[in-house]
């Protein structure tokens, strides 16, 4: 049972949400009085409460979603709040649906989407993973952060061939290494206000680090927003090459580190927007003609379930007409389908740009 002080804070937070008439978050939409009353006293076996779930969305009323899972059990215990939010965000993933088993499919179906190199600047495919037996950021102790980092770095040090590389802990990182990683756009910063408010940045930078291979086409973030972010990327539009590299890396890491998986929700992550396949396949792409008509761009993107963001990701502008375009759907379809959807959409956008 959650203690009185927590419940009092929850009551205050609920009042604040109710009063915020211009708040458009999914948290506000689905945290009804009856759901709130049903959940406010509950506590996971690791001690997480509804407060851990909603505090970021209460503090940041401009959140799009507004909830995070403090541990794996939270998705089950606080399901009356998470399930409708998941259904709303992952359009059509109903509360009775079950995410399919992992399936990377025929990796040779992926191609270079821009062989002439006129439109696509770079291509990236990433996935998130949580290590079994550990809670998510807000509930991790300093000792757990250190333990996880040592498991991850020793696992990665066994990678061979194209994936072979170096692990750089954030703790005690020299200014030179730091600058080098910033120049390569590899270094992640301490979380933004949304993550800060979710208590995702405790004991920073303990247990956080970055691994990359020698060609800088394969990257792993340790204990950023998720326990692991596994990233494959390169300049140009060869999605096939990028995808194949990611798949081989995930399979290698999984042999040594068991991942948190949920029967219904797929692979578990800190933020419910990343559940399921956890896969985000994206390109940085120049579409000057389509970009002049943002509505048209959004319309085609919507048809292929693509998400259009600014150049530097979420909450940013398109610099020099360069957009970050990715698959929006991560749940209720396989890894193969998620990336295929993105490939089909990008090919269509390029075709339209050429015809304009």
From Swiss-Prot:
Keywords of the record: Allergen, ATP-binding, Kinase, Nucleotide-binding, Transferase
Catalysis performed (reactions): L-arginine + ATP = N(omega)-phospho-L-arginine + ADP + H(+)
The UniProt annotation places ATP binding at: 122-126, 185, 229, 280-284, 309-314
- The entry's L-arginine-binding residues are 64-68, 225, 271, 314
Phosphagen kinase C-terminal domain span: 119-356
Tissue occurrence: Muscle (at protein level).
**One GO CC term, this protein:** extracellular space
- GO terms, molecular function: arginine kinase activity; ATP binding; creatine kinase activity
Similarity annotation: Belongs to the ATP:guanido phosphotransferase family.
Q: What does this protein do?
A: Catalyzes the reversible transfer of high energy ATP gamma-phosphate group to L-arginine.
Q: What is this protein called?
A: Arginine kinase Scy s 2
Say which species the protein is native to.
Answer: Scylla serrata
Organism classification: Eukaryota, Metazoa, Ecdysozoa, Arthropoda, Crustacea
